[in-house]
Curated annotation (Swiss-Prot):
Keywords: Glycoprotein, Host nucleus, Secreted, Signal, Virulence. A motif (RxLR-dEER) lies at residues 48-69. Belongs to the RxLR effector family. Residues 1-19 form the signal peptide. Residues 175-194, 404-451 are annotated as: Disordered. This is Secreted RxLR effector protein 111. Secreted effector that acts as an elicitor that induces cell death in host plant cells. The RxLR-dEER motif acts to carry the protein into the host cell cytoplasm through binding to cell surface phosphatidylinositol-3-phosphate. GO terms for cellular component: extracellular region; host cell nucleus. It is found in: Secreted; Host nucleus. It comes from the Eukaryota.
Length: 451
């Protein structure tokens, strides 16, 4: 805008000089200026009108080179340069006014109407007020708005305020680089990579192994009845050789903590009628619904953990004995070969058998008794009922050898098998057995409540 205004002011000054000289008739001035329909048409550069006025041309150049000159000063200087408006023709004045209006103020809504016939002081006041009209900020000029910039495009002089504002805008647009680089722990990276090497078992492999294992359970008269998810979990633990095998108690605990009520109901059906009878005895005490489910959960967890340990041992023994048969029945013959070593399999099986021994029961026993203690402290019930529930937990743990027999159902002698069938009719080989005196104590509590 400043360049356009400077050009318009040069045209105004040129018109004034041409009018003041009054040496050329309008007919003779057609070589330089032709006035048609109030339009100014120049056939040559405006500097030709200043050719014979060296002093005024030098003064105008010095004024344009002034670094402290603003738009208001430029407008005031141009208006005062038109000393005598009466000597100029009407066409020249109208042409200069149109150029100033169109180029200095391109928007017609904010364009002021200048009258060059007014005295210089009044015209200067109008131009100075018009220069303060607010205009739309451009995207590139919004950062440095309010900064006084020189009218000359070749100037490189800046005030302290200008330099400070430019520095602030530069800091706001430049992205800060990180001075520190965070490095991961090498041990953590190795453990993460090692954990990611867990093999993904295709569904058709899980289904085939599950079918063969069910045939094995039917032939051995074992009633584990694993689900497809349990078979997949056992198979993943078997083929995983890049990490240390987790104890079955840890795997089962992480799996059991997300069980819902319907999952517990389905699981209780696989743990035998002995556990169901014990839980039904608890239900006969008319405990609050929330307390009854909280009391059932530790018993179901312990019984299902016993089932898992026995089932894991049997499953790994089955895979070790039938690995060739399983591999040949699969499209991918090399699924069980190469990566899983016999040393890892033996270590995993030894870990499972170690968990089944009596010396590893202390931690599990403490957990079930602590869970019962937390539940009893949470609910307000009679002390006699609390004592009966604690006694049920102690008797439950003392008969751990009956809950997890080391001898499989198929390996028992006919005499022991007949005795077991007479003692526990309709029970699975890993069911729970609640002694008779304990049931009598619950009957005593129930009779006292009805009395």
């Amino acid at each position: 805008m400043r360049g356009t205004l400077a050009t318009a002011l040069l045209l105004v000054a040129s018109c004034r000089i041409a009018a003041e000289s009054n040496q050329i008739n309008p007919q003779q001035a057609s070589h330089h200026v032709g006035t048609t329909l109030n339009k100014l048409f120049t056939k040559s550069s405006p500097r030709r009108f200043l050719r014979d006025n060296r002093e005024q041309r030098v003064a105008l150049a010095l004024t344009a080179a002034n670094e402290s000159r603003t738009i208001e000063n430029a407008v005031t200087s141009a208006v005062h340069g038109i000393t005598d408006a009466s000597t100029t023709t009407a066409a020249t004045r109208d042409a200069a006014r149109d150029i100033l209006n169109q180029h200095a103020f391109p928007k017609e809504g904010i364009r002021p109407q200048f009258d060059l016939n007014l005295p210089p002081s009044e015209t200067s006041a109008l131009l100075t007020g018009a220069s303060n009209i607010p205009q739309r900020n451009h995207a590139f000029s919004s950062i440095t708005s309010g900064i006084a910039v020189s009218s000359s495009r070749t100037s490189n002089q800046r005030t302290a305020k200008t330099q400070a504002n430019l520095d602030m805008s530069h800091q706001g647009t430049v992205r800060k680089t990180l001075s520190k680089t965070q490095f991961k722990n090498p041990a953590a990276s190795k453990s993460t990579k090692r954990r990611k090497k867990a093999r993904i078992i295709p569904p058709f492999v899980v289904n085939k192994v599950d079918t063969l294992y069910r045939e094995h359970l039917t032939a051995k008269s074992l009633e584990f009845d694993p689900t497809i998810k349990e078979t997949e979990a056992m198979l993943k633990l078997y083929v995983e050789s890049t990490v240390d095998p987790l104890p079955v108690s840890t795997v089962h605990f992480n799996h059991f903590r997300y069980f819902k009520d319907q999952d517990l109901t389905l699981l209780k059906e696989k743990l035998g009628t002995t556990l169901e009878s014990a839980l039904s005895t608890l239900a006969a005490l008319n405990l609050p619904p929330g307390m009854l489910k909280a009391i059932e959960r530790p018993f179901v967890w312990y019984a299902s953990l016993a089932r898992w340990r026995a089932m894991y041992c049997d499953f790994f023994e089955f895979l070790n004995a039938n690995s060739n048969k399983i591999a040949t029945s699969l499209p991918n013959v090399e699924f069980f070969g190469g990566e899983t070593s016999s040393t890892v399999r033996d270590q995993l099986l030894a870990t499972l058998k170690e968990e089944m021994k009596t010396r590893t029961k202390t931690r599990r026993n403490g957990k079930i008794m602590n869970d019962l203690k937390v539940v009893l402290a949470k609910y307000n019930v009679e002390e006699e009922i609390k004592a009966a529930i604690r006694g049920l937990g102690e008797q439950f743990l003392k008969r751990d050898h009956e809950i997890i027999p080391l001898q499989r159902h198929s390996r028992r002698s006919p005499a022991s098998q007949s005795r077991s069938n007479n003692q526990r009719t309709g029970l699975t080989p890993y069911g729970l057995q609640i002694p008779g005196p304990e049931r009598d104590s619950f009957r005593h509590i129930e009779s006292n409540k009805h009395a």
